[in-house]
């Protein structure tokens, strides 16, 4: 009985995660006892469990930080805001996937199970407080990601993407564990983050070569999840070969979860090596912003262009990680990631809607889409303009606050690179918008001429997600202050 009460006590700290686990069990039960005609229930249960989990998080807001499960899991506002972002991503991605699944005849239950399980892994990673949980949680996320990326088994590109993703993911995980082993040994056998720092102080190993090896290895391992340059090789192939709803899901959730983990790992165990990891991240940010935006200009595939764009975007996010909580770096990073979720998913909503109906992903094949589907074209244009940082859209104010925090922290060169590459990104975003809005008959492609709005009920779900994303992407600057204030409350 005592063990049962202890389980209930610790379980109360992971109540949002328990809701998702219950949703997973319910999905399996319904799928095994009903026929294919009851598929709307599967979407309903998945979306409801995600919304209920978000509600549970909001009710727990501003509670005192707590450590549960013998120090393995930490609950505080900082972790919960990242969990909220992951849940928000998943909630918006499920409506985006309805039409794609119907058109491609993918297995629905397994798809939803993998999405919810990956979400669960990302949430546990946000609250992980020891090395074992920090390793197991992203592996849970990664395994589901591998399965989702190869979900269309008959597609050669999907199989190629999965193979590359799996091999590079396995290699990065082994490098990450290697770094953890150096931390574990140098700290005298500690696995909790704060205890590792205390152990390094006691053993006088915080400036040893072993810590440098650990720092490099962990940076490489986490870099695979964030996909900054030069750890970006898998990103374009996975984006191009994977099903579009899967790409939309992975493009945001993996970065949110990895950012939450990176801030805690770099800020606590490597407290005495701040100059070293700042330098490493500055190099990654510069390479990401330059390579990501320059290579994106040359792409002809919409998904590959967004892949390189995401590499550049993570360079901006890294600026917030480097600044830290001293100059509102974390607050600006959280705010920008919230806007990035809406901007990116809104852009992918267009691809999900256009791709299955036309069978193309080429950027030039979108020419003249405004003449056939004005809502889709205008919504896409707003999201792309926000990604480029055009005022008065949300992306502009998100970047402005992020760069201002970096400037105040003395990262003048890094911010200058960010400003220049943002200007470069505007070029290829405007190029796409020009194609979308063209009305010249000579430029309108056969794919657009034959384009038909879907009569399926699933079209409404895509439009619902897109409306939410467009509204969030076009929030004017007057809403920035309360958003920044909420983000500042999350600092640990």
UniProtKB/Swiss-Prot annotation:
InterPro entries: NADH-Q_OxRdtase_suN/2, ND/Mrp_TM, Ndh2_N. Its EC number is 7.1.1.-. The keyword rRNA-binding does not apply. It comes from the Eukaryota. GO terms for biological process: ATP synthesis coupled electron transport; photosynthesis, light reaction. One of its GO terms (cellular component) is chloroplast thylakoid membrane. It is an enzyme of class 7 (translocase). Keywords: Chloroplast, Membrane, NAD, NADP, Plastid, Plastoquinone, Quinone, Thylakoid, Translocase, Transmembrane, Transmembrane helix, Transport. The chain crosses the membrane at residues 6-26, 39-59, 81-101, 106-126, 131-151, 165-185, 209-229, 277-297, 305-325, 329-349, 377-397, 400-420, 466-486. NDH is composed of at least 16 different subunits, 5 of which are encoded in the nucleus. NDH shuttles electrons from NAD(P)H:plastoquinone, via FMN and iron-sulfur (Fe-S) centers, to quinones in the photosynthetic chain and possibly in a chloroplast respiratory chain. The immediate electron acceptor for the enzyme in this species is believed to be plastoquinone. Couples the redox reaction to proton translocation, and thus conserves the redox energy in a proton gradient. This is NAD(P)H-quinone oxidoreductase subunit 2 A, chloroplastic.
């Amino acid at each position: 009985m005592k063990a049962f009460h202890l389980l209930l006590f610790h379980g109360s700290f992971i109540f949002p995660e328990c809701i998702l686990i219950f949703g997973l069990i319910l999905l399996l039960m319904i799928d095994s006892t009903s026929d294919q005609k009851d598929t709307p229930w599967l979407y309903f249960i998945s979306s409801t469990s995600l919304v209920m989990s978000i509600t549970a998080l909001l009710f727990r807001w501003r509670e005192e930080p707590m450590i549960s499960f013998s120090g393995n899991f930490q609950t505080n506002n900082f972790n919960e805001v990242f969990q909220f972002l992951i849940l928000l991503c998943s909630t918006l991605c499920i409506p985006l996937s309805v039409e794609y699944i119907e058109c491609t005849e993918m297995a629905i239950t397994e798809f939803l199970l993998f999405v919810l399980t990956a979400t669960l892994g990302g949430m546990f990673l946000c609250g992980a407080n020891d090395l074992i949980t920090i390793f197991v949680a992203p592996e849970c996320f990664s395994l589901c990601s591998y399965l989702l990326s190869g979900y269309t088994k008959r597609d050669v590109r999907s199989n190629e993407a999965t193979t590359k993703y799996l091999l590079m993911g396995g290699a990065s995980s082994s490098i990450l564990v290697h770094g953890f082993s150096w931390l574990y040994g140098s700290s005298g056998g500690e696995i909790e983050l704060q205890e590792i720092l205390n152990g390094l102080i006691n053993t006088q190993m915080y400036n040893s070569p072993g810590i440098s090896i650990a720092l490099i290895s962990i940076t490489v391992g986490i870099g695979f999840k964030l996909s900054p340059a030069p750890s970006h090789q898998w990103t374009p192939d996975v984006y191009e070969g994977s099903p579009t709803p899967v790409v939309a899901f992975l493009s945001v959730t993996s970065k949110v979860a990895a950012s939450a983990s990176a801030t805690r790992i770099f800020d606590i165990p490597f407290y005495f090596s701040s100059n070293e990891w700042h330098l490493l991240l500055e190099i990654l940010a510069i390479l990401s912003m330059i390579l990501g935006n320059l290579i994106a200009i040359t792409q002809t595939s919409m998904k590959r262009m967004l892949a390189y764009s995401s590499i550049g975007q993570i360079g901006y996010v890294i600026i917030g990680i480097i600044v830290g909580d001293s100059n509102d770096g974390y607050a600006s990073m959280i705010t920008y990631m919230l806007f990035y979720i809406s901007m990116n998913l809104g852009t992918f909503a267009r691809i999900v809607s256009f791709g299955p109906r036309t069978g193309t992903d080429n950027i030039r094949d979108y020419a003249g889409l405004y003449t056939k589907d004005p809502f889709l074209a205008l919504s896409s244009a707003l999201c792309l303009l926000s990604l480029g940082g055009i005022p008065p859209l949300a992306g502009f104010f998100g970047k402005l606050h992020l760069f201002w925090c970096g400037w105040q922290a003395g990262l003048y060169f890094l911010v200058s690179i960010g400003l220049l590459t943002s200007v470069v990104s505007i070029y290829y975003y405007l190029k796409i918008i020009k194609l979308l809005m063209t009305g010249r008959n000579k430029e309108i492609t056969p794919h657009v001429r034959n384009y038909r709005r879907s009569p399926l009920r699933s079209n409404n779900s895509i439009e619902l997600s897109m409306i939410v994303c467009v509204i969030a992407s076009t929030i004017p600057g007057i809403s920035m202050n309360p958003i920044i204030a909420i983000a500042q409350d999350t600092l640990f």
